[in-house]
Amino acid sequence: SALDPEMVGEVLELMKDLAKEGMTMVVVTHEMGFAREVASRVLFIDDGQIKEEAAPAEFFEHPKDPRLQEFLSKIL
């Protein structure tokens, strides 16, 4: 859900700490920097369908799906 902008950093830091401790999380986010840093797998969902799934390095450096390429070009 949307967070108070003043709380986003604090919540993301807590989630990073939990991930470092080995907690498994399923996170839906537009915070791509966070996903790149914390995730072991990243999925791109478009129109209710999984369009791409990869390790963060592959996902961000070599996206295959045209919609994902477009999305990343606009936000990174």
Regions found by a protein language model. Give the residues of each.
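ABC ATPase nucleotide-binding domain "signature" loop
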Residues: 1-3
